[in-house]
Amino acid sequence: MTEFKPIKEGKVREIYDNGDSLIMVATDRISAFDVILKNKVTNKGKVLTQMSKFWFDYTRDLLPNHMLSVDVQDMPEFFRQPQFTGNSMMCRKLTMLPVECIVRGYITGSGWASYQKTGKVCGIQLPEGLKESEKLPEPIYTPSTKAEIGDHDENISYEQSIDVLEKLFPGKGEEYATKLRDYTIALYKKCAEYALSRGIIIADTKFEFGLDEEGNVILGDEMLTPDSSRFWPLEGYEAGHGQPSFDKQFVRNWLLANPDSDYDLPQDVIDKTIAKYEEAYEMLTGKKL
């Protein structure tokens, strides 16, 4: 059996080169505030991979994505070991674009903090009088740069995203920046509407895109997982305060309340975290993991 070593290790994912494709493995690691925590969250990698698969299938009519298969039988023998089952995705190779495409449909988190001070979120002027967690009149696109592990992503304007892409792809910056913005908002609207019908509010999320060999923009990375999105229960939703969530916000809140924890979570927080991830998966897909 041929051994494979990751060519890249992110905060949560490991990427393996499979010749004309890549194999992306979602581990059970969890990160918060750009730090990898000491604990593993059992089954988390499976939730991320299967949730992404669901959304990639759901949005394929809107634009192509990089997913080829999540069946380890389609992958080399090395990936048929138990630790890869359910949490591995074979993907097309793309040239990834260095812009994190964030879309916000509700005002919360850092966006709410910024709005209270300036009336703006990432430089975008919003109407007066919005409450915390309120739905925005229209989703807003707030891109950021992609940071290395340990660094913080930096918010940029749409205009700055043109400059970032123009430097890498002369003559194409505006075209690519516009596609990223328009695809991001279209994907969010389609998926947020579906999620609402299943009892979940997608408050915000981020997408990442790449280029195929012909220069077409393709959706990559993960899609609408509890790691990349804020999911709130529709039941009991009321603007004016923070919302309970099915995502990493639960972990962030615990860390904020326990600043001396040294990023070491107690077992009950780990158990509640995976329960929330699995509940979100079941509500959205109608299936158990």
Model-assigned labels for residue ranges:
Residues 21, 96-98, 198-202, 214-217:
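Coil-to-beta-strand transition motifs
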Residues 117-120, 126-175, 219, 223-284:
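Anionic ligand-binding catalytic core segments
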Residues 1-148, 261-289:
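Active-site loop/lid in soluble adenylation, ligation, and acyl-transfer enzymes
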